[in-house]
């Protein structure tokens, strides 16, 4: 919204800064951070009052969780999403279609997660919205988003998959790209959702991934930098750096309240939405495969659940003591802070590896 002030730079030279994505990204970070800081306590109090017993805790998990996490309110993702929306509307170029596509997926997935959390809290059970129904709605939202991205992007490129390390290798999937893109977004949303099981575990890797993809979006949306790095130029996609900045700011604000012992959980409201946001940015910037590297921690968590379920159904035996894998390490004797901080370190290393693919080609 504030970008229009740049039109008056002739009369007010200082307004010229609103043209720059870097400046507006910084503004989005600060705005989202302050918003969550200021309104977070009130939102947490409201959630605690409305929810009563808070998020139901798994009885088959680590016994310490029954003592340390009981009564903690969920749906804290509302804080994050509010910060993202306010900062994006204030600092992003609202005429950019990519901005609305990413916001649409984020809020759509957030609504799914909110309803899921609502069912769990009101019924005090882990059985919220059925898995099939949830995946079906997610697929519809993601499918619409991908079709829009395909329609506004450059013909040929918008339906192709780019591969890291190979500057000229593109696999044009044609209309089948809609299925691939839909899978990326839905998988990202659910992978982040599975990661959100310990205080602070999901939000920091999400911020790391958002920072990485904000950087990628800025480079891919700049014809000079894209040409220098020999990555595919996508006109207009640089504006997504502002949304990624908003996520980072809102995430930092949320972490203040989510640091152990957490005052609030983001719930499916936040985890599904943030994962969907990252997946959509990856599709728009043509870095879907790089998302699997930068977000490798989320992939690991999701794969651990798949392996556990498949193994148990086929052999009756479990590969891990408990899935997702962060609970496996808890069962091995790692303390919650050890698991969380070590997983953060893994997320940083994977992000650096993913960013290295921009140059190693």
UniProtKB/Swiss-Prot annotation:
MF (Gene Ontology): metal ion binding; phospho-N-acetylmuramoyl-pentapeptide-transferase activity; UDP-N-acetylmuramoyl-L-alanyl-D-glutamyl-meso-2,6-diaminopimelyl-D-alanyl-D-alanine:undecaprenyl-phosphate transferase activity
UniProt KW Lipid biosynthesis keyword: no
Domain of life where this protein originates: Bacteria
Membrane topology, as annotated: Multi-pass membrane protein
EC id: 2.7.8.13
InterPro entries on file: Glycosyl_transferase_4, PNAcMuramoyl-5peptid_Trfase, PNAcMuramoyl-5peptid_Trfase_CS
Pfam families in the cross-refs: Glycos_transf_4, MraY_sig1
First-level EC class: transferase
Keyword Membrane: yes
Chief location bin: membrane
Function: Catalyzes the initial step of the lipid cycle reactions in the biosynthesis of the cell wall peptidoglycan: transfers peptidoglycan precursor phospho-MurNAc-pentapeptide from UDP-MurNAc-pentapeptide onto the lipid carrier undecaprenyl phosphate, yielding undecaprenyl-pyrophosphoryl-MurNAc-pentapeptide, known as lipid I.
Family annotation (HAMAP family): MraY (MF_00038)
UniProt-listed NCBIfam families: mraY
Family: Belongs to the glycosyltransferase 4 family. MraY subfamily.
Protein's recorded name: Phospho-N-acetylmuramoyl-pentapeptide-transferase
Native species: Xanthobacter autotrophicus (strain ATCC BAA-1158 / Py2)
């Amino acid at each position: 919204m504030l970008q229009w002030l740049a039109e008056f730079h002739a009369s007010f030279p200082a307004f010229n800064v609103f043209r720059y994505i870097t400046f507006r990204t910084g503004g989005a970070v600060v705005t989202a951070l302050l918003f969550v800081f200021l309104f977070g306590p009130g939102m947490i109090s409201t959630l605690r009052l409305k929810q009563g017993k808070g998020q139901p805790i798994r009885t088959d998990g680590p016994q310490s969780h029954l003592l340390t996490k009981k009564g903690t309110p969920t749906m804290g993702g509302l804080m994050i999403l509010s910060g993202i929306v306010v900062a994006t509307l204030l600092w992003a170029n609202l005429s950019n279609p990519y901005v609305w596509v990413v916001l649409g997926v984020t809020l759509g997935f957030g609504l799914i997660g909110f309803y899921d959390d609502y069912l769990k809290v009101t019924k005090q059970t882990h059985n919220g919205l059925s898995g099939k129904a949830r995946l079906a709605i997610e697929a519809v939202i993601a499918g619409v988003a991908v079709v829009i991205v395909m329609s506004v992007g450059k013909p040929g490129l918008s339906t192709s998959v780019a591969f890291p390390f190979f500057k000229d290798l593109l696999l044009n999937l044609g209309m089948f790209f809609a299925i691939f893109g839909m899978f990326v977004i839905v998988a990202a949303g659910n992978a982040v959702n599975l990661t959100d099981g310990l205080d602070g575990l999901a939000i920091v890797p999400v911020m790391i991934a958002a920072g990485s993809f904000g950087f990628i979006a800025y480079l891919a949306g700049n014809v000079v930098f894209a040409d220098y790095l020999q990555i595919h130029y996508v006109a207009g996609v640089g504006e997504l750096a502002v949304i990624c900045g908003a996520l980072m700011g809102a995430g930092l604000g949320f972490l203040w309240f989510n640091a152990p012992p957490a005052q609030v959980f983001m719930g499916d409201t936040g985890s599904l939405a943030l994962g969907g946001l990252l997946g959509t940015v990856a599709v728009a910037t043509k870095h879907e495969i790089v998302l699997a590297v930068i977000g490798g921690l989320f992939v690991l968590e999701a794969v651990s659940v798949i392996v556990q379920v498949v193994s148990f159904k086929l052999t009756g035996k479990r590969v891990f003591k408990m899935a997702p894998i962060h609970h496996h390490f808890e069962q091995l004797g790692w303390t919650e802070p050890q698991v969380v901080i070590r997983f953060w370190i893994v997320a940083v290393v994977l992000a650096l590896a993913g960013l290295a693919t921009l140059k190693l080609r």
